[in-house]
Amino acid sequence: GMMTDTGGFTYNSNRPEIFFIISQLLTKGINKDKIYRNVFNNYSLWRLRLMGYVMYTKLNVFAEYHAAYFTLTRRDLKHFHFMKGDAEGLVNMPLQIKGMKLSISLREDTEKPDTIWVSLRSVDDFPCNKMAEKYFNGGGHLNASGGHLNCTMDEAEMLVNKAIREFRW
C-alpha cells in the first residue's frame, strides 16, 4: 500500500514518516525488488495490449490546456478480456507527456447501462478533486480523484471537453 498509495513515492502528499517506516522494513530484510515486481510487473498480456490500444487509439490530448483524456467502452473492455483491476493506473500514463497537468479516464460500467466511471489524476497544484466535485459527482485528493456519471459515453465526452476548457482554479 505504501508504494501504490504514494505513486511510487512521487506524490506531494508523501510524508517523512513513510520513509522512516520503509527504512525500518528494509532493516528487517524485506525484499523490495520482489515486492515491486509483484505489484508493478505482474500484468496480463491483455492488460498490456489494452494499455497500448488506449495510448495509441483512444487518447485525446489538449496541449493548450495541459490535459488529456481517454475512454474505455464496454466493447473495448470485452475485446481486451477486461478483468477487474486492468484499468488501474492507466489514467496516470498521459501525465508522462511533457507539460501534462491533468489526465482523465472515462470507463463504461460493464454491467450498468449509462454508468461511466471517471478517474482524474493531476500533478503539481492542479486540484483534480475540485474538478471532480464540480463536473463528475465525485471528489478525492488534490492529485487523485474520481467520480461517476449517469449518461452515455458521448455525453460524458462532451462534459469532459467542457470541463477541460472551462475549469479554472
Regions found by a protein language model. Give the residues of each.
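His-Asp-centered metal-binding catalytic motifs of divalent-metal-dependent phosphohydrolases/nucleases
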Residues: 1-7
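Hydrophobic helix-and-loop "lid/oligomerization" segment in the mid-to-C-terminal part
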Residues: 7-135, 140-169
